[in-house]
Amino acid sequence: MAGGTQGVAAIVPAAGSGQRLAAGVPKAFYQLEGQTLVERAVRGLLESGVVDTVVVAVPPDRTDEAKLILGREATIVAGGADRTESVSRALSALSAGVSPEFVLVHDAARALTPPALVVRLVDMLRAGHAAVVPVLPLTDTIKAVDANGVVLGTPERAGLRAVQTPQGFSTELLLRAYRHAGVAAFTDDASLVEHVGGQVHVVAGDPLAFKITNRLDLLLAHAVVRG
C-alpha cells in the first residue's frame, strides 16, 4: 500500500462453504429474515459510522451475486482456498486506493454484531493500540485433553476469554503479519499478529456478536432478528 494513510477499512472473509451449517448455500449467502449474513455483517460495520471502506472476499463463483447484493457498499474480490488467503487477497485489493490507518477483519458469520462494538474497537485503536480484539469471559469450565481423550488439566477460567470479531489492527502490523504467515495454520488474525511479536489488547465484546456456525445458532439468530 502506498500514498499515505487515511481512515478505517474493514475486510469480511466470506468465501467459506459453511458445511457445518448445512444450509445448501455458502454460509455468507444464507438468507436470515430477508437479508444474507454478509449483507448484515457489512451493514453493521457501516452503520457504526467509523468504517470508511469494506472489502468482501467471496467464493469465486459468487462474485457477481455479491456485487448485486451489496451494490456500492463494498468492494468484492474472489476469495482463496482458506481464510488466510481470502484476507490476503482483500488486503491486496485495498492497495488500489489510499492506505487506511487501520484494518478490521470481521467474520460474515457474526452477522448480528452491534455497531457499538465496532465503535469501541476503533476507539481503542485510535487510543494507540496496534491490535485489539473483542472478548467475552468464559462461563463453562475448560479442560485440556490429550489425543486419547484423557484430561490433562483444568486451566484457570479467570484468565481465559472467548474471542470475537471484528478484530482491529494498524495496517502496517497486519501487513507484516501476513507477509510472515507462511504455511502455519492460524484460526484468527490476532494469532498471526502474535506470531510476529505483536501485542494484542482486548475490549469488551458482545453476546450478539456470536458466530453462526450450526443449526442451533441459526435458530438463535432468527429469534434475535424477529425480536
From Swiss-Prot:
GO molecular function terms noted in the UniProt entry: 2-C-methyl-D-erythritol 4-phosphate cytidylyltransferase activity
Protein keywords: Isoprene biosynthesis, Nucleotidyltransferase, Transferase
Pfam families reported for this sequence: IspD (PF01128)
One GO-annotated biological process of the protein: isopentenyl diphosphate biosynthetic process, methylerythritol 4-phosphate pathway
InterPro entries: IspD, IspD/TarI, IspD/TarI_cytidylyltransf_bact, ISPD_synthase_CS, Nucleotide-diphossugar_trans
Function as written in the Swiss-Prot or TrEMBL entry: Catalyzes the formation of 4-diphosphocytidyl-2-C-methyl-D-erythritol from CTP and 2-C-methyl-D-erythritol 4-phosphate (MEP).
Protein name, entry field: 2-C-methyl-D-erythritol 4-phosphate cytidylyltransferase
Organism for this UniProt entry: Mycobacterium marinum (strain ATCC BAA-535 / M)
